[in-house]
């Protein structure tokens, strides 16, 4: 039987000031990853804004840099940042992997 390796997914959610919305976003992304036949190898949630208060984001980036993640599921890109330069930096780091 020729079995293909399933993509390894990381789920990330962050909606500052809205814990319920963050949890719902995480659940929706998890369901989509499973629907896409991914193995969810990890996930993180941040409850605050600001780069220094986001351990979940830093953990996600370490896993990506370490080659342990093939896909990232995020409900809205604004959960990464509302600033274009931060989004550019995020994608640049992903592409260097």
Task: Give residue ranges: language-model regions.
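Short, structured surface patches at the beginning of a domain
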Residues: 1-97
